[in-house]
Curated annotation (Swiss-Prot):
NCBIfam families registered for this protein in UniProt: rplV_bact
The name this protein goes by in its record: Large ribosomal subunit protein uL22
Keywords attached to this entry: Ribonucleoprotein, Ribosomal protein, RNA-binding, rRNA-binding
The organism's taxonomic lineage, starting at the top: Bacteria, Pseudomonadati, Pseudomonadota, Betaproteobacteria, Nitrosomonadales
SUPFAM superfamilies named among the record's database cross-references: Ribosomal protein L22
Annotated Pfam families: Ribosomal_L22
Entry similarity comment: Belongs to the universal ribosomal protein uL22 family.
Gene Ontology terms, MF aspect: rRNA binding; structural constituent of ribosome
Gene from which this protein is expressed: rplV
GO cellular component: cytosolic large ribosomal subunit
UniProt keyword Amino-acid biosynthesis present: no
Record text on subunit structure and interactions: Part of the 50S ribosomal subunit.
Biological processes, Gene Ontology terms: translation
């Protein structure tokens, strides 16, 4: 039994999200939640919410035992880039890229 939760278009770069995802891949969900709760990275809070959603999906939809669940797969894919401009000297402007990503978490026995 495998249950997924997906978050699309969150304002986090995929590279920074993968740093957090690599820390919890393959761990039991209780240990993964503990690691994410005490991580200072911005992506930790976002991935924690997605993991909690996947756990709730497994419990509600499949009737799974939470203590037996592991993080089967977790990956962070690159989303679209929001392009913004900031004013510079002499009437010029510079582009600012605001990257987004898609986070997918799958939990199972």
């Amino acid at each position: 039994m495998e249950v997924s939760a997906i978050l699309r278009g969150t304002r986090l770069s995929a590279q920074k999200g993968r740093l957090v995802a690599d820390q919890i891949r393959g761990l039991r969900v209780e240990k993964a939640l503990n690691i994410l709760a005490f991580s200072p990275k911005k992506g930790a809070g976002i991935i924690k919410k997605v993991l909690e959603s996947a756990i709730a999906n497994a419990e509600h939809n499949e009737g799974a035992d939470i203590d037996a669940l592991k993080v089967k797969t977790i990956y962070v894919d690159q989303g679209s880039v929001l392009k913004r401009f900031t004013a510079r000297a002499k009437g010029r402007g510079n582009r600012i890229s605001k990257p987004t990503c898609h986070i997918t978490v799958t939990v199972g026995d």
